[in-house]
């Protein structure tokens, strides 16, 4: 018996809850520009939107993916609650599924290749939300999902720590 697959929509959904801009701090605001390319997480946004608006309300453990130029592979596993701009897709694991496994599934290059196959537009391509939710992922038990997700998240944490160490070493070398 081979590995069974399911569609992304079976384990996750797009968050549509809204939060007023005035309830979001700059440090908790995520836009496509504050998501870093090549799966490097996020930085603090430059500024909040100039006009009052409702943002997508994300929570700790949600997975945020930039939907403009998906080939840039901008993704972040939220470590806080906040608001996201309309061009950021916010995924949340359904009950009975692991948010860490959801992140691990969307972290794969094959996910971005799949999104690009269904893109809309050429200069500023965007992913097709309906097509994205049909992305195939392994169908696993919650314990298997959690195990895989936690391992991948642990690797990502270590990579980020090493990246910060390298950045500090580079800054120190420039001072010599």
Predicted features and spans:
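A short beta-sheet element
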Residues: 54-56, 63-109
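Short, positively charged
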Residues: 100-133
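Sequence-specific dsDNA recognition surfaces
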Residues: 6-60
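Non-catalytic DNA-recognition/assembly elements of restriction-modification systems
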Residues: 1-21, 138-176
């Amino acid at each position: 018996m081979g590995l069974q697959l399911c569609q992304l929509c079976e384990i996750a959904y797009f968050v549509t809850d809204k939060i007023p801009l005035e309830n979001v701090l700059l440090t908790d605001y995520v836009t496509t520009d504050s998501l870093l390319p090549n799966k490097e997480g996020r930085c603090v946004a430059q500024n909040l939107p100039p006009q009052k608006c409702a943002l997508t309300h994300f929570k700790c453990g949600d997975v945020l993916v930039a939907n403009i130029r998906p080939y840039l592979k901008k993704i972040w596993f939220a470590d806080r609650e906040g608001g996201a701009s309309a061009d950021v897709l916010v995924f949340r694991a359904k009950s009975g599924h692991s948010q860490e496994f959801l992140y691990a599934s969307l972290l794969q290059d094959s996910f971005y290749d799949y999104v690009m196959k269904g893109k809309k537009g050429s200069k500023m391509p965007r992913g097709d939300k309906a097509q994205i939710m049909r992305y195939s992922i392994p169908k696993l038990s919650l314990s298997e999902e959690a195990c895989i997700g936690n391992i991948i998240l642990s690797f990502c944490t270590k990579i980020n720590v090493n990246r910060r160490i390298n950045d500090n070493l580079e800054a120190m070398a420039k001072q010599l």
